[in-house]
Amino acid sequence: VPSGLPKYHVVLWDFGAKQNILRKLHSLDCELTVVPAGTSAEEILKLNPDGIMLSNGPGDPKDNPEIIAELAKLCQSQIPIFGICLGHQLMALANGANTIKMKYGHRGANQPVKNVETGSIYITSQNHGYTVDSDSLPASAKVSYINMNDGTCEGITYQNFPGFSVQFHP
């Protein structure tokens, strides 16, 4: 790739993205196309992205049935998809899993999570009151990170398409 040209074209589906996410993607030589929450799967696919990123955002993920339906279509496209926070929850719902309201949400920059494959533990920043119900995941999805305080799902890897997501803010 010639110097100065972006390596990847990433569509950021914006549900309330933090500016630091955009800065980080730019620093990784990504050409970004930011699209609003109401964008259809067809419109996103017309942009011909190398990858799709689902941003963080507020609220109950189940309040977004139109987004969930469009995301289910994107998951069949075989384009890599990465979700953060609300994006993580929406991707789980789009693949048949369930989300539940937590008794005590995860708030702050001191939430320990464990990579279930490597055993590595990371201190993460989180701000959410809903979690993906691990027991509801389809066979094609595997929990990749868990919260060390309460054992809730903090990450998922999908085996039927190139998708992965995390509940925390990387």
Locate each region found by the language model.
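RNA-binding accessory domains that recognize and position tRNA/RNA substrates
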Residues: 1-48, 61
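Beta-strand-turn-beta hairpins that frame and shape the catalytic cleft
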Residues: 4-10, 118-121, 158-163
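Active-site-proximal beta-strand elements of phosphoester/diester hydrolases
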Residues: 9-14, 124-125, 164-168
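Hydrophobic residues at beta-strand termini and immediately following loops
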Residues: 13, 35, 102, 146, ...
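Cysteine-nucleophile active-site neighborhood
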Residues: 46, 50-51, 55-131
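Catalytic beta-strand/loop cores that center a nucleophilic Ser/Cys/Thr
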Residues: 120-161
